[in-house]
């Protein structure tokens, strides 16, 4: 009677364990196999209907004491060397079939011994049974295979991502530096290079991108108008500095240039190549365009001459048409067409003023080299200095007859040159001059 109670109690305990394992589901199984090295895969067949607890009980019961204390399944499971045994069963035609999974963290030899011990089980519950080991799975090999496949995927993803080239990294750093160098100038906060506040000459461009492109190539005295409406800051700067208008080679650039020439005092005009914008020019194209700049006065003269030529041609055509109609009315009924020789329009030569002609050679020299020349009465060059050193050179020199330079004639310069007793002051253009000494003759390149 006591033995019967013990068996019933054991069956109840096995059933509770089965229900608990069933509730845990796959997660429990995953936890059991998480730290194992090997998994024993076996299948069984029983000549009768048995349940999972019967199979588990047979495994523990029939291997107890078979392999000694060191390989006893109960002791190994307590110490975690053997994981939870997973059994799946299904019944068909009065027989029970199923699979057994035994997780093991033992070494290969000990795991193989446990696997062989499973095949010694010949009964499950009241039924005869047979267990056959299919394979021993090396979990670490499976993990290694997973690691290799996953590493391939990660590497492929990494290689698909765009890795910036060295030049791109350098360009990113330079771009950040250029944007740091960019300043806001004037009440309108116009984008400008860092040299605009103190440079003697400035370059007026259309927009912020143009200023950044010039900064990229080392030109730091550019300022943008930011639109077709010319800011007051640009107008004010044009009266104090030597200004070069650098516009795009399209219709928009022409409109901005036209507006600049109307409201500001522009000294030189440079254009980007036809169809290109300043922001997309290379360093070579920028340098070439700036070297090819033309004086604004010369550009305006050409435009004015063309306008006068077209007006003259229009007047002659209108007069010729009127004479032809008048002759037809007053002449015979069948007037003969009058043949006129082709008339050539000859552009009158520009007559140089005596004073300008006297210094023409020196003017051409400073135009090309952007220097200042101090000349004595015999037309000998006393000093040849950069424009930035011109004032100090004048103050330290004697017997100055004329000063020729490619810059703006200011009131201060007039006063200094006059004090030195010079007779001529020749520059690119004049600023707002209030006092003009009688003994000093002031000439601009346009004159």
Curated annotation (Swiss-Prot):
The Toprim domain, residue ranges: 200-274
GO BP term, example: DNA replication, synthesis of primer
Record note on cofactor: Binds two Mg(2+) per subunit.
Binding site for Mg(2+) 1: 206, 248
Region (Disordered): 316-339
Protein family: Belongs to the archaeal DnaG primase family.
Name under which the protein is recorded: DNA primase DnaG
Source organism of this protein record: Pyrococcus furiosus (strain ATCC 43587 / DSM 3638 / JCM 8422 / Vc1)
